[in-house]
Amino acid sequence: MRTVLAGSRRAPGCGEGMFILWLVLLLFPGAPAQYSVDDLGGLGRMFDGIGAISGGGATSRLLVNYPEPQRTEILDYLFKPNFGASLHIFKVEIGGDAQTTDGTEPSHMHYPDDQNYFRGYEWWLMKEAKKRNPAIKLIGLPWAFPGWIGNGKNWPYDFPDVTAYYVVSWIIGAKQYHNLDIDYIGIWNERAYDIKYIKLLRYTLDKNNLEHVKIIASDNLWQPIAFHMLQDPELLRVVDVIGAHYPGTHAAQDAILTGKTLWASEDYSTYNDEVGGGCWARILNQNYVNGNMTSTISWNMVASYYEQLPFGLEGLMTAKEPWSGNYVVSTPIWITAHTTQFTQPGWYYLKTVGHLDKGGSYVALTDRLGNLTIVIETMSHNNSICIRPPLPDYNVSAQYATFYLQGSFKNLQELQVWYSSLDINNTKPVTFKKLSPLKVQNGSFTLQLGVNEVYTITTLLTGQKGSFPDPPESKPFPLKYKDDFSVRNPPFSEAPYFADQSGVFEYFTNTSDPGDHVFTFRQVLTQRPITWASDANQAISVIGNYQWSNVTVTSDIYIETPDTGGVFVAARVDQGGSPTDRAKGIFFWVFADGTYKVTGDLMGQTILCKGLAGVRARSWHTLTLHIDGTNAFGLLNGNPLWKEVVTGGPLNGWAAIGTSCFEFAQFDNFMIEVKDSE
């Protein structure tokens, strides 16, 4: 930790002064660089806030299944003001029924005549965010769309009025059913935009008295949207924010020339250790210093998905074990707090921001009511590498920095100090530690800055490093697990721990079945969605521990589609997320035409055995898949159907259920038994 020096001009005694000068020159050669903090020349851009994303996709899937009090604690670390990350902005995926990185999120309209504003968990998360911070800004953005939007094509813009209606219905539903006011809406995450659609979206919003909802475009690169806005006055008028992803702290000149608000509307996406914290610290400052971006939004908010899915642990914190209750408050939470706890949307950057002489950067913000916050970071190259884009080499060294307070701030006498040190060589990094107040003398103060440090210097007294008792110890997924889905009024549409990777699986009530299968788990998509990734043509939901090897998976199954329908249970499934279509494992299928097959892959191309099973649609059957070492066998309704199949594929992976295409099918009395040791 570095000392904080006041800006006194009192001359020390001769001997004392020579010793201090010698020490300073030895450790920090050169006179302290001087930096002005001044609002006399006007202010910079308005600060819009720091945010995070749930979705894109299913990144918060496991969070909803946490027990209390751990679930509330996690939400407090994310959203509660002056406690943890204290997020200003919360961006969610508008579920589109398709794979969007780590899973699928359900649409509020699976079909044209279907509207349900209680599917998934984003509604709940937005309400939890608002409960803690009523001022938090909400953003909705589609990654994918249900298939009917494209009328058979993998494209949402052939009928732009239909797409606009669909998106605006989500905004209206948020208000009508959850009393949530959506502040911003996006176009199509990291995919093509359509100028006609953007204009029609603005028209549809206004027609529905949603003039307050602002449009962000295009959630991809700066170009060509900035160029098109400069060429098209109407497009320039209807787009409120140009949002770019992973901009590397720089904005395109055309984007600046539009005069529009500029955001890093998705950034970070980095493993949440000290290097991830360093990445986040650097871009939170330098996105404005280098690129005039007034908001930076992290993908993702909380890594609450199975770690072996793509981009594991790339959230501001980690909550991937609802079965144990364990979670980890990671370094990026406290780096976020360095800015969010001492600013608010509506504050203004000063024009006096920039780079430090020996590496690093500083920003200064004010509420125009006399409050001042300065955030300083000295992240080295190797301690702040983000996932993208590549980071050019640069050097940072220890330094003194003297800040002169001028304008509205010249009479400040004392400032609060919060400090972090993220050096990867430290055995125990320091995060968000409150230091003694800094006495300002003669309008200045000097900081002795080391490498990989973050300082917040502020007039505000409200900061807090919130904490709870340690969560329970980490534990693997239980070796025995079962679910009969008998929940009359489920709080969420998905059953615990199932992570849909293609298709959508929901709790279902069979009102016409008075027997043992009134409450089931149903795959509900009947059409391939407008995809964001290379989705599988089969529906699949995974569950459990990726390290499982010797496992028995059992489920009652009900094929609803005569002749062509089919379902499976599986184990050792080795892929999820965007490459789900390439998943391998052991898949035990039965079909409505009376056949069965066992395959080594989800696509069904590697057939290990096949034959007749006598299964028909609209009748309940029980499938059991047993794998031990290199051998597998299967049971139908408790009787052997096939045996002595040599696996030959992945040695471990998740358990799974699914369907042979996008079709209605039901599952019940699901059970896993694992022989592996914990």
Curated annotation (Swiss-Prot):
Q: Which gene encodes it?
A: galc
Q: Name one GO biological process term.
A: galactosylceramide catabolic process
The record's active-site residues are: E190, E266
Specify the superkingdom.
Eukaryota
Question: Origin organism of this chain?
Answer: Xenopus tropicalis
Q: Which UniProt keywords apply?
A: Disulfide bond, Glycoprotein, Glycosidase, Hydrolase, Lipid degradation, Lipid metabolism, Lysosome, Signal, Sphingolipid metabolism
Please tell me whether the keyword Ribosomal protein is annotated for this protein: no
Q: Where are the transmembrane segments?
A: none
Query: Which of the seven top EC classes does this enzyme belong to?
Result: hydrolase
The signal peptide here is 1-33
User: What residues bear carbohydrate chains?
Assistant: N292, N371, N382, N395, N425, N442, N510, N550
Q: What protein does this entry describe?
A: Galactocerebrosidase
Q: Which residues form a coiled coil?
A: none
Species lineage: Eukaryota, Metazoa, Chordata, Craniata, Vertebrata
* GO CC, one annotated term: membrane
Q: Which GO terms describe its molecular function?
A: galactosylceramidase activity
| Biological role | Hydrolyzes the galactose ester bonds of glycolipids such as galactosylceramide and galactosylsphingosine.
Tell me the compartments it is located in. Lysosome
EC assignment: the record states: 3.2.1.46
Q: Give the protein family.
A: Belongs to the glycosyl hydrolase 59 family.
